[in-house]
A protein has these predicted regions:
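Bacterial Sec-dependent N-terminal signal peptides
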Residues: 1-22
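Aromatic-rich carbohydrate-binding modules that target alpha-glucans
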Residues: 21-57, 63-88, 125-173, 184-207
Length: 241
């Protein structure tokens, strides 16, 4: 009986450790402005960096300064570029093995680390030429390809888009209080989405680019002012009346 209890206790510990999430992740190295930057924890399994990187190397670490317990996320491919479509990683304590490559100095690097899939995906972000709004809560509805609501691009920052207008539930259509943002005047290929389905546009500023077809929803009908930052993947909305 005692042995069975010990085995069950060990199993609980194992499950706990396997499910443990990183509280923080850092990038350090010659490619990182200032030598070290803390990643943004977007969700339990998603860490993000959006900003300038210099030509050089960086390491993804569990601490700003190396210590005995510091671990690193090392790419499964040799000399892995931080710009990629998704490269798996393993965890190591050997900093020498853990370098990711940054080939050129640029201001708009962005990468995500999915700690559940153990994968890093990165890009050199290019501003979009268009951003549209459509859906059940808009005047154009879901059958709106070719006449979605065009947002206005900021003259000083091409990654910022704004829109002001009425959003309200339209009971006669499917998903009457929902809406989405598209990178073209049709449903594919570019789009942005909240992390959870039916996210209140007034309550959560996070979004991801592409992925699951989740939608925003309204808690209140009214006239809205919306600001989307495509590079930093944030959205701000307010009721203006």
């Amino acid at each position: 009986m005692k042995r069975l209890y010990m085995m069950m206790a060990a199993l609980v510990v194992c499950i706990t450790l396997c499910a443990q999430q990183y509280q923080e992740l850092w990038i350090i190295g010659t490619a990182v402005p200032g030598g070290a930057q803390k990643l943004t924890k977007v969700s339990d399994n998603d860490f993000k960096y959006a900003g300038r990187l210099k030509a050089g190397e960086l390491r993804v670490a569990t601490a700003k300064k190396a210590g005995k317990r510091t671990t690193y996320l090392v790419a499964d491919a040799p000399d892995a570029n931080i710009v990629n479509k998704g490269i798996g990683y393993t965890v190591t304590t050997d900093a020498k093995q853990a370098a990711w490559q940054v080939v050129v100095t640029e201001d708009r690097y962005r990468f995500h680390i999915d700690t559940e899939k153990k994968q890093l995906r990165g890009e050199l972000f290019q501003p979009w030429g268009e951003l549209f709004l459509a859906g059940g809560a808009t005047e154009v509805g879901w059958k709106s390809e070719g006449h979605m609501l065009l947002m206005k691009q900021d003259l000083n920052n091409p990654c910022i888009w704004t829109w002001e207008g009425e959003l309200k539930r339209h009971p006669e259509v499917e998903e009457p209080g929902s809406f989405k943002f598209q990178g073209q005047d049709r449903w594919h290929p570019k789009s942005i989405h909240p992390y959870a389905a039916d996210t209140d546009i007034l309550k959560d500023q996070r979004f991801h680019t592409g992925g699951d077809d989740t939608k925003w929803t309204l808690s209140v009908d009214g006239r809205y002012r919306i600001k989307v930052d495509l590079f930093n993947e944030t959205i701000q909305a307010e009721l203006v009346k």
